[in-house]
Structures are given as C-alpha cells and as structure tokens.
C-alpha cells in the first residue's frame, strides 16, 4: 500500500481545478503551514467532516533500553494527536470494512 504525498495532492489540484503546478504546490504548502502554525500556538485544528488535530501533554514515564534492559526515563513531552471525525470514519469503514 502506498502513501499519498504532498506532491500527489498538488498534482490532483492541478488536474482537477486547473491551477498551474506552482500554484497547486504553494496551496498545499500553505495549507499545511497554517496547520503547523496553529498547533505551535497551542490551538486545536478542526477540519469539518475530516477530523481534529490536538496537542496532548505526556508525562515522564519509565522506559527500557531494549538492548541492555537498562531502565531509562522517557521525558515529558507534547505530542500531536489526530481524531478522525464521524464522516471520515464512516467513509473509511464503508470502503475498507472494519478490520480487527
């Protein structure tokens, strides 16, 4: 299974909307930059019909070096999470079925 890339999204904008290739690439970059900036400013990103990007703080926790077995602390950090919306979930389940 392949992955959809930013270049492929730009190519689809070029084909579907008639933007020139430079404009399509800039539009894709601008879209993702807006999401990045919002998250950097601790804002939630809500894309109606798609899902939400949130920031979540994870506490420090114990970890283990798999090679040596030595216990090492995993430092506290902030992570980005994505929660798909109901419409996205429904479409994915309709096409892919539910997999366990």
From Swiss-Prot:
Residues 53-73 are annotated as: Disordered. It comes from the Bacteria. Keywords: DNA recombination, DNA-binding, Transcription, Transcription regulation, Translation regulation. InterPro entries: Hist_DNA-bd, Histone-like_DNA-bd_CS, IHF-like_DNA-bd_dom_sf, IHF_alpha. The keyword DNA-binding applies. Pfam families: Bac_DNA_binding. GO terms for molecular function: DNA binding; structural constituent of chromatin. SMART domains: BHL (SM00411). PANTHER family: DNA-BINDING PROTEIN HU, INTEGRATION HOST FACTOR SUBUNIT ALPHA. Heterodimer of an alpha and a beta chain. Belongs to the bacterial histone-like protein family. This is Integration host factor subunit alpha. It comes from Pseudomonas aeruginosa (strain LESB58). The lineage of its organism: Bacteria, Pseudomonadati, Pseudomonadota, Gammaproteobacteria, Pseudomonadales. The gene is ihfA.
């Amino acid at each position: 299974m392949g992955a959809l890339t930013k270049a492929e999204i730009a190519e689809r904008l070029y084909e579907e909307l008639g933007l020139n290739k430079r404009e399509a690439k800039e539009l894709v970059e601008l879209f993702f930059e807006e999401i990045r900036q919002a998250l950097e400013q601790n804002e939630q990103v809500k894309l109606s019909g798609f899902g939400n990007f949130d920031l979540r703080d994870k506490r420090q926790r114990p970890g283990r070096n798999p090679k040596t077995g030595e216990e090492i602390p995993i430092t506290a950090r902030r992570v980005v999470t994505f929660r798909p919306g109901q419409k996205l979930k429904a479409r994915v389940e309709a096409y892919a079925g539910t997999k366990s």
